[in-house]
Amino acid sequence: MASVLEELQKDLEEVKVLLEKSTRKRLRDTLTSEKSKIETELKNKMQQKSQKKPELDNEKPAAVVAPLTTGYTVKISNYGWDQSDKFVKIYITLTGVHQVPTENVQVHFTERSFDLLVKNLNGKNYSMIVNNLLKPISVESSSKKVKTDTVIILCRKKAENTRWDYLTQVEKECKEKEKPSYDTEADPSEGLMNVLKKIYEDGDDDMKRTINKAWVESREKQAREDTEF
């Protein structure tokens, strides 16, 4: 800016010298007009310079923002959960998570799911997606908390004072498939046979030999009891 002002000042001095030496009206009018333009421009430049200085004095150094590392994403599979009358609480342990910026810990809720994303924690991103929650939750009232080395996801139950036996519908279905099915109207011995049959089918060779031996001994004992009568 100083060089521009200097050039304008030199132009102005030169125009003044020419004006003093000029005698012809047309030339003097042209020089007078040019002199006015230069003076106006010089005045504006000086005002800009005086206004710019306080702005620079008040200007604070720009905050250095650490670049967001795009490292690979780790899928979170280990977590714990419990519940109260109003909330289902999911606990995820991530060492150092309390030290990352708040905006780096994001949770998106829907009525039957949540999606956790932790960005740039020790050079990695961490993701946890849980779909098909056992029961509906209130999206607006659900939230997250970041504690020392822990993220707590708070899913607000849509129906308060109801108990969740499982976190997801899929978990419920898997557990129920594992349970042996009993028919209350069927013969109790038939139910036992079904259980033994399942154990036999799923067991190894040693288990099968043990069941076969027990089965033979049971049949022999039953035969002896029948002959006694």
UniProtKB/Swiss-Prot annotation:
Residue ranges of the region described as Disordered: 38-60
Region annotated Interaction with SKP1, chain positions: 74-229
Tissues where the protein occurs: Highly expressed in brain and EAT cells. Expressed at low level in heart, muscle, and at very low level in the liver, spleen, lung, kidney and stomach.
Residue ranges of the region described as Interaction with SIAH1: 2-81
Record keywords, A-Z: Acetylation, Cytoplasm, Nucleus, Phosphoprotein, Ubl conjugation pathway
N6-acetyllysine, modified sites: 10, 21, 86, 119
Location of the protein in the cell: Nucleus; Cytoplasm
Residues with PTM Phosphoserine: 3, 36
Main location, first listed in the record: nucleus
A GO cellular component entry from the record: nucleoplasm
Chain positions found as N-acetylalanine: 2
Domain CS residues, every copy: 74-168
Example GO BP: cellular response to leukemia inhibitory factor
A molecular function GO annotation: S100 protein binding
Plastid keyword on record: no
Modification after translation, per record: Phosphorylated on serine residues. Phosphorylated upon induction by RA or at high calcium concentrations.
Spans annotated as Interaction with S100A6: 155-229
Domain SGS, chain residue ranges per copy: 169-229
Assembly and oligomerization: Monomer or homodimer. Component of some large E3 complex at least composed of UBE2D1, SIAH1, CACYBP/SIP, SKP1, APC and TBL1X. Interacts directly with SIAH1, SIAH2 and SKP1. Interacts with proteins of the S100 family S100A1, S100A6, S100B, S100P and S100A12 in a calcium-dependent manner.
Function: May be involved in calcium-dependent ubiquitination and subsequent proteasomal degradation of target proteins. Probably serves as a molecular bridge in ubiquitin E3 complexes. Participates in the ubiquitin-mediated degradation of beta-catenin (CTNNB1).
Protein's recorded name: Calcyclin-binding protein
Species this chain originates from: Mus musculus (Mouse)
Lineage: Eukaryota, Metazoa, Chordata, Craniata, Vertebrata
